[in-house]
Amino acid sequence: MDKQELTQLLQQVADGDVTPDDAALRLKMQPFQEIGAYAKVDFHRGIRQGVPEVIFGEGKAKEHILGIAREMLRSGQRTILITRLSAEAAAYLQTDLPLHYDSAARVGIIGELPAPGGKGRIVVATGGTSDIPVAEEAALTAEALGNAVTRLYDVGVSGLHRLLANLDTIMSARVIVAVAGMEGALPSVIGGLADCPVIAVPTSVGYGASLGGIAALLSMLNSCASGMSIVNIDNGFGAGYLASMINHLD
């Protein structure tokens, strides 16, 4: 149940279409559901935070992921997002559920994507093609949470004209997710051009001294561009989630 469904339920009670006892029963069943000894699915998260629970697939047995997803569907959740999902687990889920799987981003989505809402458009940009898997995790997360997303890939600082050729897209964005490895310069450049929040995502792409993304992370943390926030290395999900929150603010 999300905020809209809760409002509809309360309106039905006010209109006399649903009795208070029936409404109380529906709400009573909502907080969480314990599945065996391995999970407690949080059904109230959509009411508290505006977004239902997301499944982090890494480290979970494929049978456990299936059990959690089934319980979410049973509770009425229409779109289920699964991040860090292995190809093996995805194939297992697809034998039982309508799962769309992006193997590069390791993202699975069960059900239909919601119609885009929010105040505007989210732009997801990358420094290089190698950053696309992380960027796609951000883009697919944002789309699964009900946002219109524009992808702007391979526009890094080694060929700045590629970014400048897309200034209209940059300037019209509501939020920008800038994904880069190596020295992590792209978010600073975008932050100096855009009048909207920029979410920087360092990736682990790079040679030895990039230290698995630490160099890009430190570069972004020390940026002189204002209005920029930084998430963890390779955390496309965190960036897409935050971008969605910003895009849905009144």
Identify the residue ranges that each predicted region occupies.
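Short glycine/serine/threonine-rich phosphate/pyrophosphate-binding segments
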Residues: 63-65, 131-136, 160-161, 180-189, ...
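Short, structured coil segments at secondary-structure junctions
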Residues: 95-97, 193-194, 224-226
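Glycine-rich phosphate/diphosphate-binding loop of Rossmann-like nucleotide-binding domains
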Residues: 118-161
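Glycine-rich oxoanion-binding loops at beta->alpha junctions
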Residues: 105-111, 150-169, 214-215, 231
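C-terminal binding/interaction regions
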Residues: 126, 130, 168-171, 175, ...
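Long amphipathic alpha-helical segments
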Residues: 1-86, 91, 95
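Glycine-rich phosphate-binding loop
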Residues: 165-203
